[in-house]
């Protein structure tokens, strides 16, 4: 792999509605400042040629311009004059007469080398823009492989995921962020889960009824913010970008973000929405007053100071609190968050008894519980989550993605699929341990119709909770019950995330992590909220996807351009 090191800049400014000359001058001013600070790659915000809040589709089309229009000519001239790569958001008038919310990228010769049309449109975009029809293109440049997306595309995992799966090392996000959560939560989450740099340039200011708070930032493949422009300010932020290294290619547990994927389990992601199990469920009537249940993450498990009896006692206390669905932490009966081969064998031998003991609790109180454990099968040991109810074992969810620690004792590699269990308290799914780190896991469970997903975990890094957990719930509009071990490298912090997330983008503000062994974190879950998949009118997080463009996510192996990068870790 070739190591490349350069400086890049994001621009935070404002576009005047319908004032092309001012918008060109403003773009030129900020590009000049970015170049003065040494930037070789500069990113401008969304719809920078025209402004954004149009009167109508006809008004939008009068301000839109083709790829050889005045704004693109100005961008090409800037790129050529300064010898830089320059990306910007463009209100485009296509050859088909439709308006598109597009992104363009010019190389140092002034040639247009990247062109993308926004796929996931918010409500206002749907009034004047057509859905993008160019797929998820990635372009090779002297700086590295670059992909483009536009603002709201980052609110679903697939667009950035498809770019990264094609080997993108850098993603440019031309944005009009309306709320800070888009910048401060979702951009770092997408960077972290994909192991890519993301350069997000947004606006600051007021355009008619829109307030743009700002929040332009440059995020490393680890999810670390390397540069950010203050809210309500105009200017540039510059950071050093390094590509061609293994930075961000591995999870904190040492597993590879790409080599550990299991594409054979993701087929549902590329299927038409109407052909998924979720589609008919969204038309089923629910009585809100009865379609509700109290659920809880129970932060209790065996460790150096507690036995399984202590953990089961805490589960009983949670039932007395009114919980009807209990999620226990990863490897509940093991005394270590990372069991050795000997530990795993002992837990597997103990599993039948643990199932019986938890079944007694479920039968006595009419509740449901998820027991994350290890079982012995014909191919050896394997991590499995057992769903137990009043009648006994309802079903099992084998772990789909093995962590490095699991591979030390797990049996022969097996191909497992995700399953969802239909119960009287809702449709339940499980993303066990390493599974929860991969956005495909919760997406497939959502498409299978899960209302509630349990994530038994032993988090290795705070950002697995701070960035990934909330996006896993909100991306799919489902309840996510995170039951984390108190002895994990990132201890405790178990909690339940509702389908619509929290009021503040910072999860630690909404739910400060509790590290105490035995903590019970309950939530009153309303299934109607989990069946409502729109984040705003007409913007369905599942139905509005473009599955026909996601084929790369179900390919095994990945394209060779990506394997070169992913297998280096």
Where are these regions (language model features)?
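Conserved beta-strand and immediately adjacent loop positions that scaffold enzyme active sites
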Residues: 7, 87, 102, 135, ...
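C-terminal beta-strand edge segments of enzyme domains
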Residues: 137-138, 197, 203-291, 420, ...
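Active-site mouth loops of central-metabolism enzymes
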Residues: 16-20, 148-151, 300-307, 430-433
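Active-site catalytic loop in hydrolytic enzyme cores
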Residues: 65-67, 93-169, 174-185, 189, ...
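Short loop/turn motifs at secondary-structure junctions
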Residues: 7, 38-39, 83, 145, ...
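Cys-nucleophile CN-hydrolase/nitrilase-fold catalytic domain and related Cys-dependent amidase chemistry
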Residues: 16, 20-21, 25-109, 115, ...
């Amino acid at each position: 792999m070739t190591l490349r090191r350069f400086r890049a800049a994001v621009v935070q400014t404002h576009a005047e509605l319908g004032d092309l000359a001012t918008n060109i001058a403003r773009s030129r001013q900020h590009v000049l400042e970015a170049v003065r600070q040494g930037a070789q790659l500069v990113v401008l915000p969304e719809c920078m040629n025209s402004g954004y809040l149009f009167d109508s589709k006809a008004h939008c089309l009068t301000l839109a311009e083709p790829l050889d229009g005045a704004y693109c000519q100005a961008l090409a001239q800037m790129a050529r004059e300064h010898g830089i790569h320059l990306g910007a958001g463009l209100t485009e008038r296509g050859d088909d007469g439709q308006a598109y919310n597009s992104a363009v990228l010019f190389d140092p010769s002034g040639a247009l080398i990247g062109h993308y049309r926004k796929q996931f449109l918010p409500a206002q975009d749907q009034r004047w823009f057509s859905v993008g029809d160019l797929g998820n293109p990635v372009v090779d440049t002297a700086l590295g492989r670059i992909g483009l997306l536009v603002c709201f595309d980052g609110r679903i995992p697939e667009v950035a995921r498809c770019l990264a799966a094609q080997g993108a090392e850098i993603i440019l996000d031309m944005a009009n962020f309306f709320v800070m959560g888009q910048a401060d939560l979702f951009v770092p989450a997408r960077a972290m889960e994909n192991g890519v740099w993301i350069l997000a340039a947004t606006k600051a200011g007021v355009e008619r009824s829109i307030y743009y708070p700002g929040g332009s930032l440059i995020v490393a493949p680890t999810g670390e913010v390397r540069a950010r422009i203050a809210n309500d300010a105009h200017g540039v932020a510059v950071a050093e970008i390094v590509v061609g290294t293994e930075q961000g290619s591995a999870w904190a547990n040492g597993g590879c973000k790409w080599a550990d994927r299991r594409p054979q389990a993701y087929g549902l992601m590329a299927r038409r929405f109407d052909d998924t199990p979720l589609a008919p469920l969204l038309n089923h009537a629910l009585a809100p007053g009865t379609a509700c249940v109290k659920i809880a993450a129970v932060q209790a498990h065996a460790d150096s100071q507690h036995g399984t009896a202590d953990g089961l006692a805490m589960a009983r206390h949670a039932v007395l609190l009114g919980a009807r669905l209990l999620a226990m932490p990863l490897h509940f009966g093991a005394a270590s968050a990372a069991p050795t081969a000997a530990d795993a064998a002992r837990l597997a031998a103990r599993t039948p008894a643990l199932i019986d003991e938890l079944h007694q609790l479920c039968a006595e109180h009419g509740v449901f519980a998820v027991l994350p454990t290890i079982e012995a099968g014909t191919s050896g040991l394997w991590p499995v989550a057992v769903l137990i109810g009043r009648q006994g074992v309802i079903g099992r969810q084998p772990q789909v993605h093995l962590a490095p620690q699991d591979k030390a004792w797990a049996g022969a590699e097996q191909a497992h699929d995700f399953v969802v269990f239909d119960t009287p308290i809702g449709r339940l799914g499980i993303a066990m341990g390493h599974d929860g780190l991969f956005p495909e896991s919760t997406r497939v469970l959502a498409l299978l119709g899960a209302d509630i997903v349990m994530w038994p975990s032993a988090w290795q890094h705070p950002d697995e909770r701070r960035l990934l957990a909330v996006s896993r719930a909100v991306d799919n509009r489902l309840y996510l019950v995170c039951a984390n071990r108190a002895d994990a490298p990132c201890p405790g912090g178990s909690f339940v995330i509702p389908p619509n997330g929290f009021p503040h983008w910072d999860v630690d503000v909404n739910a400060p992590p509790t590290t105490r062994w035995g903590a019970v974190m309950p939530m009153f879950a309303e299934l109607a909220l989990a069946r409502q998949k729109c984040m705003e009118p007409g913007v369905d997080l599942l139905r509005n996807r473009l599955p026909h463009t996601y084929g790369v996510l179900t390919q095994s192996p990945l394209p060779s351009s990506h394997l070169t990068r992913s297998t280096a870790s």
